UniProtKB/Swiss-Prot annotation:
Native species: Streptococcus pneumoniae (strain Taiwan19F-14)
Gene Ontology biological process: cell morphogenesis; cell wall organization; lipid A biosynthetic process; peptidoglycan biosynthetic process; regulation of cell shape; UDP-N-acetylglucosamine biosynthetic process
Cofactor field: Mg(2+)
Residues the record marks as active site: H362 (proton acceptor)
EC number: 2.7.7.23, 2.3.1.157
Descriptive protein name: Bifunctional protein GlmU
Positions with a binding annotation for acetyl-CoA: A379, N385, Y386, S404, A422, R439
Chain residue ranges for the region called Pyrophosphorylase: 1-229
Gene Ontology, cellular component aspect: cytoplasm; membrane
Residues covered by region (Linker): 230-250
Main location: cytoplasm
Length: 459
């Protein structure tokens, strides 16, 4: 039989106090909705239907082409949300997972175990439950003496005895698909909230003597539903521990994993060393035996093997093997650094390609440049690429030496093996093998300083 999935993502999330739909808030670099969608993939659903509502266009944009969408124009409860999927799923034979889009910590393994449990026990409905020493606020799972599920009782309706129950409803379920839509026709809004509750379907199945079961999560953290910023931070913390643990098991060293922030899609090779307060975001990839020191921040970039990045920022760029960057360097988007390049302290590179073995040791700006191999930039070198309206390119050949405090005004080309004298302002192309000097001649005026007020003779 087929598996189907319904993801509930229509809510506004008022307690988040945000213009962004709740399910689009990010945990470890991707939205909560994407986390749920990836986990749902573990059950290999034939159809996945996502119920949208508040700012539906933003939610749909995240999963465009990956799921079917239905709209819940009015948020009238979880049961009502599932009703919206009827045109797509009603009448199909199979098992349907119903899950909220604000549960980013649920794992694919747990969902696979849930649906296997449901099938193996021939249940018409299976509730995903969890156990906690502090069940306040959760619906409790009431069982009979044979451990069979009788009902779900909400906190406000629970007796003193029922409030002591530690097994809680996580809000995730698996149903026999055909029976689900038959039962939905019999639920109503006769409750304090005036809404259609999916939990009422469980009661209907019990009344008709059909088999309802419960599968209990091994890890309570997976049950976390995010309703406010506090829970969002908790989810981020749990996810960070999971991610860092995975990398450590795979051979990555962390000085302080609790103070290291790595997004879920980051790839790290073995033998990488990561110090505290390092942040790796987006689609970043780190090669083997690279060292990332305290304070390094890397976004959507590839760093090769054996590199050393010292307290620096790298954005949307590629860094080859053996490169050293920092401290306090900034590699801005669309840059590439060849093998064994050295970018030192207070150097900024933007939109430039730099050939292997090139060095810019300190206090240099390289913008919109194509730089060859074995080039040396002296301290204080500036490539001037912007005239207030347009950006221009500088091309620097192989084996070029640029003296300190030089200004290179684009568009200009420095030929192979050329040399720029220190303090020069270069406005014209420099031929290969030439020396370019673009500065005023030094003039010494003997004894002139004695006329100045600050000279000791005038004190």
């Amino acid at each position: 039989m087929s598996n189907f999935a319904i993801i509930l993502a229509a809510g506004k999330g008022t307690r988040m106090k945000s213009d962004l739909p709740k399910v689009l808030h990010k945990v470890a670099g991707i939205s909560m909705l994407e986390h749920v969608f990836r986990s749902v993939g573990a059950i290999q659903p034939e159809k996945t239907v996502t119920v949208v509502g508040h700012k539906a266009e933003l939610v749909e944009e995240v999963l465009t082409g990956q799921t079917e969408f239905v709209t819940q124009s009015e948020q009238l409860g979880t049961g009502h949300a599932v009703m919206m999927t009827e045109p797509i799923l009603e009448g199909l034979s199979g098992h349907t997972l119903v899950i909220a889009g604000d549960t980013p910590l649920i794992t694919g393994e747990s969902l696979k175990n849930l649906i296997d449990f449901h099938i193996n026990h021939k249940n018409v409905a299976t509730i995903l439950t969890a156990e906690t020493d502090n069940p306040f606020g959760y619906g409790r799972i009431v069982r009979n003496d044979n451990a069979e599920v009788l009902r779900i009782v909400e906190q406000k309706d629970a007796t003193d005895f029922e409030k002591q129950i530690k097994e809680i409803n996580t809000g995730t379920y698996v149903f026999d698909n055909e029976r689900l839509f038959e039962a939905l026709k019999n639920i109503n809004t006769n409750n304090a909230q005036g809404e259609y509750y999916i939990t009422d379907v469980i009661g209907i199945f019990r009344e008709t003597g059909e088999k309802v079961g419960a599968y209990t999560l091994k890890d309570f953290d997976e049950s976390l539903g995010v309703n406010d910023r506090v829970a969002l931070a908790t989810a981020e913390s749990v996810m960070r521990r999971r991610i860092n643990h995975k990398h450590m098991v795979n051979g990555v060293s962390f000085v302080n994993p609790e103070a290291t922030y790595i997004d879920i899609d980051v790839e790290i090779a073995p033998e990488v060393q990561i110090e505290a307060n390092v942040t790796l975001k987006g689609q970043t990839k780190i090669g083997a035996e690279t060292v990332l020191t305290n304070g390094t921040y890397v976004v959507d970039s590839t760093i090769g093997a054996g590199a050393v990045i010292t307290n620096s920022m790298i954005e949307e760029s590629s860094v080859a093997d053996g490169v050293t960057v920092g401290p306090y360097a900034h590699i801005r988007p669309n840059s590439s650094l060849g093998a064994q390049v050295h970018i030192g302290n207070f150097v900024e590179v933007k939109g430039s390609s730099i050939g292997e073995n090139t060095k810019a040791g300190h206090l240099t700006y390289i913008g919109n440049c194509e730089v060859g191999s074995n080039v040396n930039f002296g301290a204080g070198t500036i490539t001037v690429n912007y005239d207030g309206k347009n950006k221009y390119k500088t091309v620097i050949g192989d084996n070029v030496f640029v003296g300190s405090n030089s200004t290179i005004i684009a568009p200009v080309e420095l030929g192979d093996n050329s040399l720029v004298g220190a303090g020069s302002t270069i406005t014209k192309d420099v031929p290969a093998d030439a020396i370019a000097i673009g500065r005023g001649r030094q003039i010494n005026k003997d004894e002139y300083a004695t006329r100045l007020p600050h000279h000791p003779k005038n004190q």
